[in-house]
């Protein structure tokens, strides 16, 4: 072999080595950043109790949400019930608008009689289970007097709950052009409700946390409207992942939450499932694939990823102290410091085999307190920082993530004599320190 060929061979080996070295980390990075591939315009998955995001794709992009809008309608009704402003057994008689929409067979509806009387409970179940549009408008009128005023409440509540990118234009999620010319004042005929996937997760989390009874209704696979009357009608749930339905999910208990579909929104679904104390909330916007099951196929991918790879782990128990942050200084107190502890247990969804990759992160409101100090005074926040190689999506709301650090006991203010003696001691300690520094400087 001549020298020229040797050089060419050596150069080829160098190039090959560099290529393998460079490409290997890139492959690893890609795998880390894309643990699953969700075929939808946007998606997100969170663990409910901690707000930890387990997966996210275009989650901050505002998109049409179709009938998932009814989750806000349900929230406002349940709030009104809780506040005593509306009762389950109070009755409602449809006005011309609600009657007209209820007779539109091209929309999801239970037909309502113009002179009929319907309880709030009946209208709520028709909305939550069968996504009945006229029933949702009726709820809006019951709660706010008109759908226009209800839409104002929807947007105000969205802001209050911490949503950041949203636009609610009606109580149903229908495109306004399908409201037979009755779109709420201040909205145009071409509008429909739009919310980001992340904000839908925020809404779902609040709905389940604030009014967990929603799951008692959203988990009903099928029932009847006005059973035993001339108006009896089957009401199957559009959430096919419920037990006994065509896309039933068997690894965990699916008990909600809301589907949605319009021409512009495509196929959407906010789902929730629980297993072994871990509740997962998912959102899929404009899912691709099969028209009827695509949103459930994509949700299944997220559920599988969560329940196959994560479990809830208690990072700190209630009353635990964090190494390096066991106390905080107290000015003018009988004691010069006080212990600080967690105010409740801190648990997170931890990926299998990665427990060691979670490190405590403490943020104190200030470096010291001033006596008197009451037991249970909040002094800071404890969260966990992921230090592993996998993709970390953070929390749904970083301000609310983690648990509070609070004082372990009371600290009374020291009396004037003790404070005076401390001041004198500090004064002489300062003088002595100056003398020592001066003498030390001579040698």
Curated annotation (Swiss-Prot):
GO molecular function, a single term = serine-type D-Ala-D-Ala carboxypeptidase activity
Enzyme class per UniProt: hydrolase
Q: Where is the active site?
A: 67 (acyl-ester intermediate), 70 (proton acceptor), 131
Q: Where in the cell is it found?
A: Secreted, Cell wall; Cell membrane; Membrane raft
Pfam name, any one: PBP5_C
The record, for InterPro entries, names:
Beta-lactam/transpept-like, Peniciliin-bd_prot_C_sf, Peptidase_S11, Peptidase_S11_C, Peptidase_S11_C_sf, Peptidase_S11_N
Recorded catalytic reaction(s): these are: Preferential cleavage: (Ac)2-L-Lys-D-Ala-|-D-Ala. Also transpeptidation of peptidyl-alanyl moieties that are N-acyl substituents of D-alanine
* SUPFAM superfamilies per record: beta-lactamase/transpeptidase-like (SSF56601), Penicillin-binding protein associated domain (SSF69189)
Span of the signal peptide? 1-31
- Residues reported in the UniProt entry to bind substrate: 258
Q: Which UniProt keywords apply?
A: Carboxypeptidase, Cell membrane, Cell shape, Cell wall, Cell wall biogenesis/degradation, Hydrolase, Membrane, Peptidoglycan synthesis, Protease, Secreted, Signal
Q: Which GO terms describe its biological process?
A: cell wall organization; peptidoglycan biosynthetic process; proteolysis; regulation of cell shape
The EC number on file is 3.4.16.4
Q: Which GO terms describe its cellular component?
A: extracellular region; membrane raft; plasma membrane
**The keyword Membrane is assigned to this record:** yes
The annotated pathway is: Cell wall biogenesis; peptidoglycan biosynthesis
Q: Which family does it belong to?
A: Belongs to the peptidase S11 family.
Summary of the function given for this chain in its UniProt record: Removes C-terminal D-alanyl residues from sugar-peptide cell wall precursors.
Q: What is this protein called?
A: D-alanyl-D-alanine carboxypeptidase DacA
**Which organism is the protein's source?**
Bacillus subtilis (strain 168)
């Amino acid at each position: 072999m001549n020298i020229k060929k040797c050089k060419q061979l050596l150069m080829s080996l160098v190039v090959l080595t560099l290529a393998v070295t460079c490409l290997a980390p890139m492959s690893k990075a890609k795998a880390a950043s894309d643990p699953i591939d969700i075929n939808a315009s946007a998606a997100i998955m969170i663990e409910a109790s901690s707000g930890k995001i387990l997966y996210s794709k275009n989650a901050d992009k505002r998109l049409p949400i179709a009938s998932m809008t009814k989750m806000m309608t349900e929230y406002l009704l349940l709030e009104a019930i809780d506040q005593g402003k509306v009762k389950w057994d109070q009755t409602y008689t449809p006005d011309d608008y609600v009657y007209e929409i209820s007779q539109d067979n091209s929309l999801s509806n239970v037909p309502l009689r113009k002179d009929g009387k319907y309880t709030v409970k009946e209208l709520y179940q028709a909305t939550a289970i069968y996504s009945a549009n006229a029933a949702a408008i009726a709820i809006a009128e019951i709660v706010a007097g008109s759908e226009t005023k209800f839409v104002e409440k929807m947007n105000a509540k969205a802001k209050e709950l911490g949503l950041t990118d949203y636009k609610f234009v009606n109580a149903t999620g229908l495109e306004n052009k399908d409201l037979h010319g009755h779109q709420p004042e201040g909205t145009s005929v071409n509008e429909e409700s739009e919310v980001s996937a992340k904000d839908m997760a925020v809404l779902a989390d609040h709905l389940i946390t604030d009014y967990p009874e929603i799951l008692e209704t959203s988990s009903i696979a099928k029932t009847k409207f006005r059973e035993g009357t001339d108006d009896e009608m089957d009401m199957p749930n559009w959430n096919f992942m419920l037990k006994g339905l065509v896309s039933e999910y068997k690894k965990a208990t699916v008990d909600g939450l809301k589907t949605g579909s319009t021409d512009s929104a495509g196929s959407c679904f906010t789902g929730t499932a629980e297993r072994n104390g871990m509740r997962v909330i998912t959102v899929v916007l404009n899912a691709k694939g099969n028209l009827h099951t695509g949103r459930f196929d994509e949700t299944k991918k997220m559920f599988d990823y969560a329940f196959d790879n994560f479990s809830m782990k208690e990072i700190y128990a209630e009353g635990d102290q964090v190494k390096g942050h066991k106390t905080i200084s107290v000015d003018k107190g009988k004691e010069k410091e006080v212990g600080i502890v967690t105010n409740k247990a801190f648990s997170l969804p931890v990926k299998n085999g990665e427990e060691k990759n979670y490190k405590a992160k403490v943020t104190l409101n200030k470096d010291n307190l001033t006596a008197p100090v009451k037991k249970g005074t909040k002094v800071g926040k404890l969260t966990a920082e992921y230090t592993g190689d996998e993709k970390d999506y953070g929390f749904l709301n970083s301000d609310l993530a983690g648990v509070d650090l609070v004082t372990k006991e009371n600290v009374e203010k020291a009396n004037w004599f003790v404070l005076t003696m401390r001041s004198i001691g500090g004064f002489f300690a300062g003088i002595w320190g100056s003398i020592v520094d001066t003498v030390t400087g001579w040698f």
